[in-house]
Amino acid sequence: CHLGVSTFLCEAAIACMMFAGNYVFIHYLGEDGVAAFSIACYFFPIIFMVYNAIGQSAQPILSYHFGVGDAMRVRSAFRLALGTAVTCGLVFFALTALFNHQIVAMFIDRSYPAYDIAVAGLPLFASGFIFFAVNIVSIGYFQSVERARPAMMITVLRGFVFMVLCLLGLPLLLKEPGIWLAVPLAEILTFLVIMAIYYRKHQWVRR
């Protein structure tokens, strides 16, 4: 039961990001800002599903080899999942940065002010896709090796604490770019927490 809570919270975090993001965008940029942010809300869950699929595909392999005590196979499977997710993150970021005009044009006419807001903001928003990949796969890893507490802590920090704090605080420092960079910063902070756990435990495959 405890292991499944992290999966539930990962899904709930998307809703939290959307609600908090809508509040911040309408506060700073009005209806045009919300319209621009809605584009990110359309494909952010799709990217999450890709990363989540990678993590879930690796979970049976990780769980089995963890159960039989084969630490080397656990490590190699985790690295393969991480490499696949990071590669996808690089591709998603590159596509968003290179084709931001085309992506926005699928949702908003070029004559609307929201178009320019979205074109400028999407590459900033996409800068966190690589860290997003590492975080989601890492949460799945912790679930697979029966480390429910780190998985739950990372999920709560990522999806609720860091996300809300960054969305509320970063725009005060960076104005409009800070709104778009809030989610990437939350992913980076989560990544740093994961690294801290890694160095504390030395080997993730040990309980």
Model-derived regions: residue spans:
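Membrane-helix interface segments
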Residues: 32-33, 148-150, 175-176
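Short runs within selected transmembrane alpha-helices of multi-pass transporters and secretion channels
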Residues: 52-55, 125-144, 150-162, 166, ...
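Hydrophobic alpha-helical transmembrane segments in multi-pass membrane proteins
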Residues: 7-19, 23, 52, 84-93, ...
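Helix-terminus/linker motif at the lipid-water interface of multi-pass membrane proteins
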Residues: 8, 15-42, 46, 64, ...
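Structural signal for membrane-spanning alpha-helices in multi-pass inner-membrane proteins
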Residues: 3, 18, 22, 49-52, ...
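Small-residue-rich hydrophobic transmembrane alpha-helices
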Residues: 36-94, 98-100, 132-154
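Short alpha-helical transmembrane segments in multi-pass integral membrane proteins
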Residues: 1-5, 62-128, 169-207
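Hydrophobic faces of transmembrane alpha-helices in multi-pass small-molecule transporters and flippases
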Residues: 1-20, 46, 50, 122, ...
